[in-house]
């Protein structure tokens, strides 16, 4: 069973993913901490899993859930690195695909920024997520699910 697993605590494209997978046979699993609890009723193809509010509780649950034919959306580079050999595709909500070539650079940049902040330096946060970013993600995501999950062999 193909599913899209979303690291859902801070994912700005959750609604886009749910909308783009409607009627495709692809299931969506959103993993969130209880601090992000919602009573919004979701479509039948969507499953919301709530976990404790611990620092990596969502990540641990995602690692347990993922299968080799899944697509995972996360902005967490550490989680992405753990999933590269488990999931079919691991992508960021900005639309880029994590792979063995870029993950080490991303982790090194994250570490260098953390060290700089620890020594008293200040770093800029991420740029605001725009409608253009949403459109870019939707285009890339749609192409991926059609290429890897919806095309059938004749």
Swiss-Prot record:
Q: Which residues cross the membrane?
A: none
Origin superkingdom: Bacteria
A Pfam match: DUF188
Q: Which InterPro entries match?
A: UPF0178
**Which HAMAP family does this chain map to?**
UPF0178
- Of which family is this protein a member? Belongs to the UPF0178 family.
Which protein is depicted? UPF0178 protein SSP2038
Q: Which organism is it from?
A: Staphylococcus saprophyticus subsp. saprophyticus (strain ATCC 15305 / DSM 20229 / NCIMB 8711 / NCTC 7292 / S-41)
